[in-house]
Amino acid sequence: SIAKDMDTIQKQTGIPTIFIEADLDDMAAAYRTLGDILGRQEQAEELAQFIDRTVTMAQTNAAKIPESQRLKVLFGTGSTGLACNAAGSVQADVIDLVGAVNAIIPEEVTNRGGGTTVSLEEVYAVEPDVILLSSGGPYDTLTEGDWAGLTAVQQGRYYEIPGLPYDWMSSPPSVNRVLGIWWLGNLLYPQLYDYDMTAVAQEYYRLFWHYDLSAEEAAGMLSRSTLRT
């Protein structure tokens, strides 16, 4: 077990060892724990409250979306865009939380971190409403190759997940997923998740990265990641 592994490491090194959960539901508590350990309770509480506000906002909005209106999202990673993370994994939990549906649930999960490779035929079979691609994927060539027959591609409903300083959904599944909730909710259901995404990104970067993000920098990050008009 993880607890046993932590005990072993602590005994071998003589250094106090803790395990921090990566689940979004536990992340605020994790920051509060770190604040207690490091003596930075005030800063940790500010971060934890942002996370709590984010998760509560998403849960409230998702509850308003009827099952019949939940968008099917293909979340493709890797250079081919065909490595798909399983529903319920920490790599894909942002999709579930904002009220969408993971379009492809691999029958056999062979690699939770990097995703399970599926065929393009499987993608066509589910006909996703929206396609999300990680950085380094086939975003630039999607309209020219085998993906071009998909309705989501033809209608411009494909996007590249922002990735600075880390991916906002996975790779690795870091605290940036908190910002990913705001981004994906606003992208998929803008009438429910109605706010200025640039302002949210600026607040997040100030709190979590101690960086004053300019409007121009935010626009650059979101250039492949916002609704096309």
Tell where the protein language model's regions lie, with residue ranges:
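Proline-aspartate-enriched helix->loop->beta-strand connector
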Residues: 1, 15, 119-136
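Short, structured coil segments at secondary-structure junctions
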Residues: 12-13, 98-99, 153-154
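Extracytoplasmic substrate-binding proteins
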Residues: 4-83, 162-228
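Alpha-helical, coiled-coil/dimerization segments enriched in small aliphatic residues
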Residues: 84-114
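A ligand-binding cleft/hinge motif common to bilobed small-molecule-binding domains
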Residues: 1-11, 134-149
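Alpha-helical scaffolding within the catalytic cores
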Residues: 4, 60, 90, 115-122, ...
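Short beta-strand and adjacent tight-turn residues that come in two discontinuous sequence segments
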Residues: 19-20, 105, 133
